[in-house]
């Protein structure tokens, strides 16, 4: 019997009130869904409105490395797994260990992000609000499917042309910019002979803009033995941006399970100084050679706890000039008790190293070794009302100590309604910040 086709159309009207410009914005759009078979799905949106998506946490970041924000828009979340080319790109880790930022060629938060500033005359300035406000999308389309042992996905999105309020000191006027166009293509071939898993994939992305295009290509491979004890994941990629030399990078990760609940991981990566995937992906930095490892022990059905997970991990890295630019060791432990309350303890030690990023192109400088400590407690999150908090301390890069205090309360009267209240206090002493040129204080 042939499967029945499924399709849906959801038209909508969105009204946005802009209190700064004292304007009302009206958007009429529609979402489309079509599944001609169980192995193929097409979704599209025209003039989408993402006002219902959960807002991001407020993060004050004055460093040279970008903060990574999770995707929360449903259109981009659905079927996102096919574009996750390696475990390093998966942001859904539940390990107690400190995982760090992802390595991914596809970060859909770039789509509809901050606009590219328009060119203005010397002495004129664009209003800050227009430079940081998300750009509207004209539309997006996504196709995902599977044919035998081949899985594939294609995504395209188109931004509207942004408008900027410009001031030259005498009068204000409007200047129009140009939006970007985004494209993603993914192909994954899988095989499992004799119970072992083998796969090879290709992932390509493109960002097209009048100021210059950015194209990234990646090849990934995966292997797991039939017993599931040994797992290997690897990816190599290159970037080609207008006006920038072609860059290369890659990594390989090994994971070995000695027994259930006991694993050891080892990762090796290399990123040259020209690799740049951040027009549509995310890399915390380039110009790096890094080795990292992690050891995780998970125990269940203990006399005093339901589960206990202990994790110790660390990394060392240097840049292309041979400078030791980072190294640390992290010890974490999470105990989930029989009443589902939990306690999390983390201790991190960062080694003396050179910081070659936060001078913003003005050379490298030496920073001290540092210690971070934190202790957190949380009640049972499955109950309608839950709460928790944590306290922590950290050493600053050139001396001084900072302290953090966090608390939250959550009330979920039913599956469709939730109220969350969070408090974060950070008291910093000796915060090292770039001022201008070679001045850091």
Residue ranges and their predicted role:
Residues 1-318, 437-441:
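Surface-exposed, low-hydrophobicity segments enriched in Gly/Pro/acidic/Ser residues
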Residues 136, 231-441:
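Exposed, low-structure sequence patches enriched in small/polar residues
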